[in-house]
A protein has these predicted regions:
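Compact, well-ordered interaction domains used in eukaryotic information-processing assemblies
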Residues: 44-48, 52
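Extended alpha-helical interaction segments
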Residues: 1-24
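Short, hydrophobic/amphipathic alpha-helical patches that form generic packing surfaces
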Residues: 53-65, 108-112
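Poly-acidic low-complexity segments
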Residues: 13-15, 51, 102
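Short, structured coil/loop segments at alpha-helix boundaries
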Residues: 18, 50-51, 117
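Charged interaction scaffolds used for protein-protein
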Residues: 1-9, 31-45, 70-137
Length: 137
């Protein structure tokens, strides 16, 4: 998956280690469940709000494989993660505010990438099932 921000193309690849350390799959599944009920406008709004908070973490994880020179951090210890996350947040702010980027389209593209990527698809489906079970209880 390739995204263009600040006039630069970034090749997003969700590697296993970066995704596992980022811990966003279960959060993303819960957001999907919140947004899936067409009669729950509050859940949809909360889901959108949570997605705004989560997107920088997802993008940062996806940047680790091909752009660690610019956005890399120690995946084992988390050293420098907050600094790199801040850079991604600034990049997303610029994308939305200055470039008139479509955040919802970006969210859709990233979610589709996760849903169609082999190991991520399976993880996402498992976490979605867990989230649905928790909501039904």
């Amino acid at each position: 998956m390739t995204i263009t921000m600040n006039g630069k193309e970034y090749n997003i690849k969700f590697g296993n280690k970066a995704v596992a350390r980022a811990g966003f799959i279960s959060k993303l599944a819960k957001i999907g469940v919140m947004q899936s009920d067409p009669d729950d406008s509050v859940g949809a709004i909360e889901g959108m709000e949570q997605m705004y908070l989560l997107m920088p973490q997802i993008i940062l994880a996806g940047l680790q494989a091909n752009h660690s020179d610019e956005f890399g951090y120690n995946l084992t210890t988390g050293k420098d993660r907050d600094e790199q996350l801040g850079k991604v947040e600034d990049m997303l702010d610029h994308f939305v505010d200055e470039e008139n980027g479509d955040f919802l389209k970006l969210q859709e593209d990233v979610t589709n990438e996760i849903l169609h990527n082999g190991f991520l698809k399976r993880l996402f489906e498992e976490e979605t099932a867990k989230a649905q079970d928790q909501i039904q209880k």
